[in-house]
Amino acid sequence: MKKITILLASLAMAFSVSTASKAEYKFNFVMHSDTNNAFWAAVHKGFKDACDQVDADCQMLTLSGDGDQQEQLQNLESSIAQGVDGIVTTITHPTIFDAAVDEALAAGIPVITANTDHPGGATGSN
């Protein structure tokens, strides 16, 4: 949970600072599972708690079936179309999400991967 709090705080600080009565930022967590799994239920709670701490409007987009990469890709593309301020996602395929991540970055939407080792990074770098 501490990593998620730091992650969201970092995303929030990346944007201009102003005061508003409603949530200033919208973040989506696009995951490859649902929250029926105890691990992802804990991640969901941590994500929600972190969002509450930075007063962000956050959604965790889960799948109707565990591991459905096409549904996950649709959720990622939907997040981009919504113009969210940042996306956290798991990358479960080496190439299927590349175009969507590139599209998000081109639109100025930061994308952070979670629970995913980068093939060019150190093992356990997630």
Predicted regions and their residues:
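A residue-level marker of the well-folded mature domains of exported/periplasmic proteins
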Residues: K3-T5, S21-N126
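C-terminal segment of classical bacterial N-terminal signal peptides
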Residues: M13-K22
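Sec-dependent signal peptide recognition
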Residues: K2-S10, A14
